Regions:
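Phosphate/oxyanion-binding active-site loops and adjacent basic polyanion-contact surfaces
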Residues: 1-7
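Acidic/histidine-rich catalytic cores and adjacent linkers
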Residues: 8, 12-52, 56, 74-233
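Short, surface-exposed amphipathic charged segments that create phosphate/polyanion-binding patches used
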Residues: 61-75
Length: 233
């Protein structure tokens, strides 16, 4: 609740102290702060506060969802993350998370973002016998090795080497598709279009906590000193 209370104070005093309004909240996925600001309406009924998502935190949701589905299926006696070929290994999950982040970061509209997200999944399913690159970007600058080779009038290389062991589409699609559909919904992606992250904020926080550990009590002067010196770095 500390973040909620801090936001309540910052938003309510912004006009009086700084003569400005904070009309956008860059969220890390925690809905409590945004819900509170929507409730108290610090700038009145006519001025709404919009919510945008940190694309790094959104990408982490995919990794968490994939690891959770592996764990849940294991409890039911279904192996998705074993060592066999085409399994949803930790390396595969890391790769898919990177692809998802790149799909969001490299798109400037909800439609293009949605297409890029699904392209990243189909790319991971692709094999020499059944290439699934129809949604991947075309051209010589494409991140997709298959489309890049076609644009250069070359024969694409082997999928086992360039996709790094394609995922078992038949086995994994029923488990992965609901996750990808949920994480490519218009409402979520519309909050990611600006491509913003909380990197700068988290970097500043790490500098502050290095000077004043947040798990120990500190005086007001100590906290002010930590904030001031961190901001000067």
């Amino acid at each position: 609740m500390m973040e909620v209370e801090a936001a309540r104070v910052l938003w309510r005093r912004s006009v009086q102290r700084h003569k400005l309004r904070y009309t956008t909240l860059l969220s890390d996925g925690d809905a409590k702060t945004f819900a509170e600001l929507t409730k108290i309406k610090p700038y009145g009924e006519d001025i709404e506060i919009d919510k945008e998502e940190c694309i790094n935190h959104v990408s982490k949701r995919l990794g968490s969802a994939l690891r959770n589905i592996v764990t849940d299926c294991r409890k039911r006696g279904v192996t998705l993350g074993g060592r066999g070929k085409g399994q949803l290994t930790q390396n595969a999950i890391r790769k898919m998370t990177i692809y998802y982040n790149r799909a969001i970061r490299g798109s400037n509209s909800v439609d293009s973002m949605k297409k890029a997200v699904m392209a990243s999944l189909h790319h991971c399913f692709s094999t020499d016998d059944r290439p699934r690159h129809e949604l991947c970007p075309t051209g010589v600058d494409s991140w997709c090795f298959f489309q890049e080779a076609l644009a250069k009038h070359q024969v694409p290389g082997p999928h086992d080497k360039l996709v790094h062991t394609p995922l078992n589409e038949k086995k994994l699609t029923p488990h992965l598709m609901p996750i990808y559909k949920r994480l490519s919904e218009d409402q979520l992606l519309s909050r990611c279009v600006s491509g913003k992250t909380q990197n700068a904020n988290e970097c500043l926080h790490s500098l502050i906590w290095a000077r004043c550990a947040k798990d120990h009590f500190a005086s007001c002067k100590r906290v002010q000193f930590a904030v001031t010196t961190a901001a000067r770095v």
